[in-house]
Regions:
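N-terminal/domain-start alpha-helical segments
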Residues: 1-119
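Short, intrinsically disordered, charge-balanced linker/junction segments flanking boundaries
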Residues: 119-125
Length: 125
């Protein structure tokens, strides 16, 4: 089963997202802090990561994941929508970037695409 590590400190976002991922057939491990997420990053197939966390900034979490040599896809989920925020997020190690508010169907499609790419099942043009 594919495991989503959901890192979001706002229960109004994390709880419905966790349910949606569960309905899609994913195992979900949810954390509201960066430190908690870093303790559980091993074994995750994708990380859905908020930037504004109470302890460690999501950018730092992404950098630490990459510093460990992990290639787990990271999808940043944030209210920050400036072009510079997108660039900084991708440079920190994110594979994709979704701004809040988001459309659930699009977010789920992006997660599926990242999981496919990571597992080598992406269809080549």
């Amino acid at each position: 089963m594919t495991t989503v590590l959901l890192v979001e400190d706002d229960p109004a976002i994390s709880e419905p997202l966790a349910r949606a991922f569960g309905r899609e057939g994913y195992e979900v491990r949810a954390h509201g802090t960066g430190k908690g997420a870093l303790e559980e990053v091993a074994g995750a197939d994708i990380i859905v990561l908020d930037l504004g966390l109470p302890d460690i900034d999501g950018l730092d979490v992404a950098r630490q994941v990459r510093a460990q040599g992990l290639t787990t896809p990271i999808l940043m989920l944030t209210a920050r929508s400036e072009d510079t925020d997108l660039v900084v997020g991708l440079d920190a190690g994110a594979d994709d970037y979704v701004t809040k508010p988001f459309r659930l169907a699009e977010l789920l499609a992006r997660v599926r695409a990242q999981v496919r790419r990571a597992s080598g099942e992406a269809i080549e043009d």
